[in-house]
Amino acid sequence: MRLLDFKRDGADWPLREASRFVAAGGFRWHVQELGQGPPALLIHGTASSTHSWRGLAPLLARDFRVLTFDLPGHAFTTSQRRPDLSLPGMAEALTSLVAKLDFAPRLVVGHSAGAAILARLIAEGRLAPGLFVAINGAFLPFEGFARSVFPAAARLLFVNPFAARLFAWKADRTTVANMLAGMGTKLDPRGLDLYVRLMSNAAHCGGALEMMANWDLSRMPDELARIACPTLLLVGANDRAIRPEDARKVAGRTPKARIEKLQGLGHLAHEEAPERVAAPIREAAVAAGLIGGG
């Protein structure tokens, strides 16, 4: 499958001037770094990339040194070997990256599955942030019938060598817009174009499918209980991918968690209205003593 090429496919990539490539843990990571101040790490969700932070990262960079990257199997991060895209595999890969960069984040922000990766790293003591922010965090396993059906369906698609190509072939503008609408999100034309570009690439689709096929959150409820830092759960009230009411269960298991609901926003809240997401993050960072309140 043809990989995305940064010179060709990323010629107009958001925040391209902040991009570079770093070798760590067997991967060639596409990373972006901008701003000055306490270090902040941002992790996108399944099937996304650094572009997801195009609006929020510059706002946070007013106070923080912000680091974002493409997850293994996604967008412009590549590997010579077949990567382990399970939750433990992702956590191990990220550990190698932050070690290589000598990056010890004080603020960590994760969207959807990216929040679950951060929760695992914090619970295991690999990261020790002063504030953990989850944007529509995907922390809880599917319940009931869906618990076995959805991962099994992803595995069936992944083992079919034509599945990723079929997904990419079908990823026209209307299909991707409908997929995003199904998550309660409507993006501007630029945001939609970027997702069409990603989802039209079979290698990127294959990475997302493999990640879903290998995702196991069965330990997550116990791991949430080991997160000692202040935790802000930002919840899009219109999210149709992660049930907004799940945040109450997550907060009940996480010692220092509080919920802030974002009315009118869906699963990709930080892309829909980055300024509305940046404001509570900054307030929480001030309260946690990470930055001044001026």
Predicted regions and their residues:
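Catalytic histidine-centered segment of alpha/beta-hydrolase-like enzymes
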Residues: L265-A278
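Active-site loop/oxyanion-hole signature of alpha/beta-hydrolase fold enzymes
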Residues: V22, Q32-L34, L67-V109, A113, ...
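Flexible "cap/lid" loop of the alpha/beta hydrolase fold
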Residues: A123, P129-P161
